[in-house]
Amino acid sequence: MKIYIIDNGGQWTHREWRTVRDLGVDSTIVPNTVDADVLADADGIILSGGPASIESEISKLGNIKEYMHRYNYPVLGICVGAQFIAIDSGGRVSKALHAEYGKKIVNFTSKDGIFYNIPDSINAWENHNDEIKSISDDYIICAYSDTCRVQAFYHKNRDIFGVQFHPEVNNTEHGTTIFKNFIEKCRR
């Protein structure tokens, strides 16, 4: 099994790689500009977080649109990766009313997809200035916080998932469980 971590310039991309590796899966970090042919053997991809502001810097996200649409593997978007999925679906992302950095309580309304075996509420690590305001009806919004309406979502028919928070950071409770559940989707 092989999972590629698409590097969007996030400070914790190596944590995502290490978490997947520590769960026993071959993983490789690649820049978001790599040719999509490199991902032909992928069983899944993770779109890392990054410093890009979607509104003004979407070009810094390289080829991730092609990576999502060329192959039919599971996709997990983290932070700016999730924001890209929302925009790609026809949703909207813009500046958050309050930039977030630190722990936040995230409440789950549904635990389907990769969000099973997680409590109804977790402490999660946040680090974002932009946030998802809306997403296409093809997706289910399954988690929120008191300041961010879209903390997690999943596609109704495909294995595409997104989280605004950072499950790879130790301060996020049950973050490893989210990665384990994603890996299980990649095994199918």
Swiss-Prot record:
Pathway: Purine metabolism; GMP biosynthesis; GMP from XMP (L-Gln route): step 1/1. GO terms for cellular component: cytosol. The keyword Zinc does not apply. PROSITE patterns: GATASE_TYPE_1. InterPro entries: Class_I_gatase-like, GATASE, GMP_synth_GATase, GMP_synthase_A. Keywords: ATP-binding, Glutamine amidotransferase, GMP biosynthesis, Ligase, Nucleotide-binding, Purine biosynthesis. Pfam families: GATase (PF00117). GO terms for molecular function: ATP binding; GMP synthase activity. The keyword Zinc does not apply. Catalyzes the synthesis of GMP from XMP. This is GMP synthase [glutamine-hydrolyzing] subunit A. It comes from Picrophilus torridus (strain ATCC 700027 / DSM 9790 / JCM 10055 / NBRC 100828 / KAW 2/3).
